[in-house]
Amino acid sequence: ISPYLYGFWLGNGNAVKPEITVRTCDIDDIKSFIGHEISSWWMQNGEGSAIFRIPDLKAVLVKSFRDKAISTKYLRASQKQRWELLQGLMDSDGCIGTRKAQSVYVTTIKQLAESVRELLWSLGIKNAMTDSPSTRCGKPTGETLYQIRFTTFDDQPVSKLNRKISRKRERVKDTRSCFHYLKNIEPLSY
């Protein structure tokens, strides 16, 4: 499936059914971004979101939502495809702050958090992960919440949603680099 849809599914998709959950305000945008047939969709009662059924997602379903992690095939894809994967992740479970344009990806699945960090590193983006007890409506859920923070600039395509893109900031030349750069790639000799 497309990297964008795969990323969105990792964040807001049903692990065992070919479905994703989309915020009501994003329905039209997400429909245009996913690039796959939506066989049906319906509004969730009182949740402010819709469920999209996308048959092509059957190819990536797992036994439990706890089994979600970015596949090596996607982590080793082209740079353009990895950016699209990040966009799907950020459009589903990420946010870009208004103050410093800091991006945050949030999940309760540790191996997904670790694979998101690997994706960011592969794009040259420094990041940091913290964990804290997860709560819902102020009540502990018994799970751990993993937050991955990184800084983004207006020349980095971390989201496709206009409400998130508008929060990115212009890159300042005289600041410490927020990236790692590759100097050389050499084959291993066995």
State each model region's role.
Residues 1-137, 147, 174-190:
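Intein-associated homing endonuclease modules of the LAGLIDADG/DOD-type, together
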Residues 141-145:
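C-terminal polymerase-core module
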Residues 153-170:
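Long beta-strand-rich cores associated with HINT superfamily self-processing modules
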Residues 148-152:
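Phosphate/diphosphate-binding loops
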